[in-house]
């Protein structure tokens, strides 16, 4: 889910669930020239086609083979409330993707299964340490003393 500068409510990730992920990966490489990056700790492979959205490939366990589209949400809990109040159903509640964000899976009233994705807040840049701030103050003082001579 890299490079997700899309706006909320956009499709930002496509996930393929395959009964034979190695065969699917070979097929997509051979036909479309896609490159995959394996994420062994998640039993997952990421891909980035020539244009967005990118996606992932995983073994279809406890689910049929197919495609799951992820929609960017600013607030998954609020979006899930809207989904249920409009006749949809939560299939999988909000869960963390360590280091990336959160996701949840839902169905619309007709049975279409989709997912939500919420990014982790980006850490703020570190403020200057006291040592750096002291050096900066010393440089400014030195410059001003040169000017006053």
Predicted regions mapped to residue ranges:
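Short beta-strand micro-motifs in enzyme catalytic cores
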Residues: 12, 43-45, 67-69, 100-104
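Short glycine/proline-centered loop/turn elements that form peptide/ligand docking sites
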Residues: 40-44, 96, 123-124
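Conserved short beta-strand elements that form part of the metal-binding/catalytic scaffold
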Residues: 33-66, 113-118
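Vicinal oxygen chelate
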Residues: 20, 71-113
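Tryptophan-centric aromatic hotspots in well-structured domains and transmembrane helices
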Residues: 13-14, 27, 32-38, 102, ...
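N-terminal beta-strand motif that seeds the catalytic metal site of vicinal oxygen chelate
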Residues: 1-25, 52, 67-69, 119-149
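Residue-level hotspots at or immediately adjacent to binding/recognition sites across diverse folds
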Residues: 13, 21-24, 32, 48, ...
């Amino acid at each position: 889910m890299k490079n997700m500068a899309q706006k909320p409510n956009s499709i930002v990730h496509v996930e393929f669930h395959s009964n034979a992920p190695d065969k699917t990966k070979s097929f997509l490489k051979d036909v479309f020239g896609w490159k995959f990056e394996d994420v062994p700790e998640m039993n997952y492979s990421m891909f980035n086609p020539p244009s967005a959205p990118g996606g992932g490939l995983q073994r279809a366990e406890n689910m049929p083979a197919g495609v799951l589209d992820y929609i960017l949400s600013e607030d998954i809990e609020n979006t899930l409330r809207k989904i249920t109040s409009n006749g949809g159903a939560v299939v999988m509640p909000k869960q963390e993707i360590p280091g990336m964000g959160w996701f949840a899976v839902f169905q619309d009233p007709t049975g279409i299964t989709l997912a939500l994705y919420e990014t982790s807040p980006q850490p703020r840049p570190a403020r200057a340490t006291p040592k750096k701030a002291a050096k900066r103050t010393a440089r400014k003082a030195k410059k001003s003393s040169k000017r006053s001579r």
